[in-house]
Amino acid sequence: MTIPIVIEQSGRGERAFDIYSRLLRERIIFLGQQVDSNLANLIVAQLLFLDAEDPEKDIYLYINSPGGSVTAGMGIFDTMKHIRPDVCTICTGLAASMGAFLLSAGTKGKRMSLPHSRIMIHQPLGGAQGQATDIEIQAREILYHKRRLNDYLAEHTGQPIERIAEDTERDFFMSPDEARDYGLIDQVIDRHAAGSRPVAMVNQ
């Protein structure tokens, strides 16, 4: 995939940025593919950089992802909780599996979705092969991640853990309005003024 280049004019001449570097200057991070260790390292590095640059300003994490590695995603999640700025999450297109989990992990009141996105939660996927002992070890690990993710989803959404466990047994797709009612996000957004950031409406 060719990454677009942005040319900026200044008194010192022209400067060229790839589009993601230019967005990073505006404190925007784009998670736009399957979550793996390489992507997680990039997202974590950007979060830490923006935290060091200004701990008071919000970070905007746009998510369009089918999910991916649980351990890689948890690295992003832990960093979101570790840094000082609020992390506003915005779903554009699809937030499924770990993508939906990270969407729900944004700062309460600042978790959003564009109106035609889809959001899906389910239990962790995994496969094991080899000797019976190896399969048993992998099964225990999957059950561990399942419990942890369900606990956090219950915390993020306010839903009873029993409902989370039931709903994640199979792929559970939601519209943005349904995800808002479920507690995964706080607001469905359409457009915002030029030069501004999307801001969730928080009930007082």
From Swiss-Prot:
Stored InterPro entries: ClpP (IPR001907), ClpP/crotonase-like_dom_sf (IPR029045), ClpP/TepA (IPR023562), ClpP_His_AS (IPR033135)
Subcellular compartments: Cytoplasm
GO cellular component labels: cytoplasm; endopeptidase Clp complex
GO molecular function: ATP-dependent peptidase activity; ATPase binding; serine-type endopeptidase activity
Catalytic activity entry: Hydrolysis of proteins to small peptides in the presence of ATP and magnesium. alpha-casein is the usual test substrate. In the absence of ATP, only oligopeptides shorter than five residues are hydrolyzed (such as succinyl-Leu-Tyr-|-NHMec, and Leu-Tyr-Leu-|-Tyr-Trp, in which cleavage of the -Tyr-|-Leu- and -Tyr-|-Trp bonds also occurs)
Active-site residue list: 97, 122
HAMAP family for the chain: ClpP
Subunit structure: Fourteen ClpP subunits assemble into 2 heptameric rings which stack back to back to give a disk-like structure with a central cavity, resembling the structure of eukaryotic proteasomes.
Family listed: Belongs to the peptidase S14 family.
NCBIfam families, per the entry: clpP, PRK00277.1, PRK12553.1
Protein name according to UniProt: ATP-dependent Clp protease proteolytic subunit 1
Origin species: Trichormus variabilis (strain ATCC 29413 / PCC 7937)
The gene coding this protein: clpP1
